Amino acid sequence: MDFKISLKFQPTGDQPEAIRQLTDGVMNGEHAQVLLGVTGSGKTFTMANVIANVGRPTLILSHNKTLAAQLYEEMKSFFPDNAVEYYVSYYDYYQPEAYLPSSDTYIEKDLAINEDIDKLRLSAVSALLSGRKDVVVVSSVSCIYGMGGPTAMANSVISVKRGETVERNAFLRKLVDALYLRNDIDLTRGTFRVKGDTVDVFMAYSDNVLRITWWDDEIDSIEEVDSVTFQRIAEFADYKIYPANLFVTSKEQTESAIRLIQDDLLKQIDFFESVGDHIRSQRIKERVEYDMEMIKELGHCSGIENYSRYFDGREPGQRPYCLLDFFPKDFLMFIDESHVSVPQISAMYGGDRARKQNLVEYGFRLPAAFDNRPLKFDEFMDMVNQVVYVSATPADFELEEAGGVVVEQIIRPTGLLDPIIEVRPSENQIDDLFEEIVQCREHDSRVLVTTLTKRMAEELTEYLLAHDVRANYIHSDVATLDRVKIMNDLRAGMYDVLVGVNLLREGLDLPEVSLVAILDADKEGFLRSHRSLTQTAGRAARNVNGKVIMYADKITDSMQRTIDETARRRQLQLKYNADHGIVPQQIRKDIKGALSGFMDSVKSTENSAPVSTSQPRPTSTSYRPYIEPEPTAFAADPVVKRMTRKQLEKSIADTTELMKAAAKNLDFLQAAQYRDEIVRLQDELKLKE
């Protein structure tokens, strides 16, 4: 099936020329190109048109899950009849396995998987396995992390055809091999049930159930039914069922893997014995033998990903399989906000290697654990066929890669201009900011404020709430899907102000924002570099009254470059508007998106609680954001014995948040202490039953 783009508007401004140049470049075999487009110029729209023109499976890589979600929503609206997929990390919480030699502390892996994102990941891989050409996958850097190989996945695809003779039990064995679980009582995603001659399969990548009925050994009907009402939705002559997990293996591969693990275990034991380290020798022996026994009996073990090389049949040091392996060789890639995404890709391998070094060195893992890793940067680049780097501020690497093939997109279809930038003294910056917020609120527009630290963002939010301003914050401690919800609530008018650190930058599409305030703009560094300031200022470029205020006591080189470049672009835009009789038009954009369906089911944390626009603005007593408290050893407190069930549940929830925050800050020792507190509190809660 070809790409069928849904266009509410026709390309205007710089877009037609940018689309033509990029399409010609891809068709002529250009390996790399740069799309240098200002904020609000419609880069995503240009990308969609190029995808439709080229007609190849496409990967769009974004540097964080929030922007990936936004891109996914937009691409879904452009290609409603094609396969637009979403592939990001499915962890709501992830504490990696670690060992701290200084305190001789081993911390076990702990995680929480988001089932909705897991479904979308499986859907993305299934679409690629199907061989469709009209596939767009929007991904975070997760696409370079290890997963099962395409051959193993393809071999596990189950094809069924009406009228085909298939023994039912043979079909059930195939389902089990594809990692579906039998559950005749509670049919959930990734399970199947059998009732007489009918088999219901709740596909792992779908919201619906596939119902297959037999007449003797012949397949009589294949239907898709609603997972709740079981009403028929569609009927098929044939159908393909894709695996329920991204890591599929056969019995033969498992047996081979166990033999290889055993061989490497003996080598590692001999190594530790040769250097006289009997403790590490005994440790690796006990741990690996236990894992092998679990794999033999159950087919899996905790940390089985550290043995992935054996199951995949890879040699030591050979790169793992990843999402890129599922694309055809002629696929097209867009790297959005490339000035941030490219460095992120290059940094992933080093961080992973550093953490595992201690685990291998001290006998917790075999050296094969090193091969369960993200791609190295050169491995990633070797897999790229043709790429378009997309950024308002491309870095030197992208410009060099493109060899001068740079397509500029300065003019906005709406006629909107780059925002006016003002520099004001940092003295009394909060009072001055408050006055600006009041003015914006009177005009029913929103405000973004960027600070230098998460603590500053939280405290400023608390201050604004205390002064009757509907405010919230987002930073790395806020759950991914909650960030999207908070930004949608800002657009809907539930908040007046959104405070952030490094998330209020690339790609955020918030046309209701008329003011961007940058606190401490003269503090040179990563968050106040030329590119960072330009990107942050760009958040005001989607509003007809857009303005940027930099609070600073001096004008740094980065500030001056941003001011000069913004002024240059503004002059070009003014001239274009005058020549073509264009009056700037405010952007109007729907708020609800493709991710909203499953976001509604995600438990909302306190700092994403919506504020009804029909109610009076909350004060600090009626609504306060979550400010991280000092750690408290709840379970060690004698008061715990007198706590009610509700109080215990709240303490467990609070401690869980602290554990997640500690893990994100790589304070694994503290996170483990919180985990132990949670276990003790849960034990106390059971006694209350």
Describe the residue ranges of each PLM region:
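Conserved pre-motif I regulatory segment
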Residues: M1-L36
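Pre-Walker A (Motif I) flank of P-loop NTPase domains
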Residues: N28-V34, R56-P57, K133-V135, S445-R446
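Walker A/P-loop
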Residues: N28-V50
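N-terminal cationic and glycine-rich segments that engage phosphates or anionic surfaces
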Residues: V34, Y87-D432, E436-E442, T461, ...
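Conserved strand-helix element at the start of the C-terminal RecA-like helicase core
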Residues: P57-A69, Y86, R280, C440-E462
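Conserved RecA-like helicase motor-core motifs
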Residues: P80-S89, G303, R446-L448, L460-D482
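Conserved helicase motor "Helicase C" RecA-like lobe of SF1/SF2 P-loop NTPases
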Residues: T151, T453-H475, R680, E684
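Conserved helicase ATPase core of P-loop NTP-dependent helicases/translocases
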Residues: V478-G500
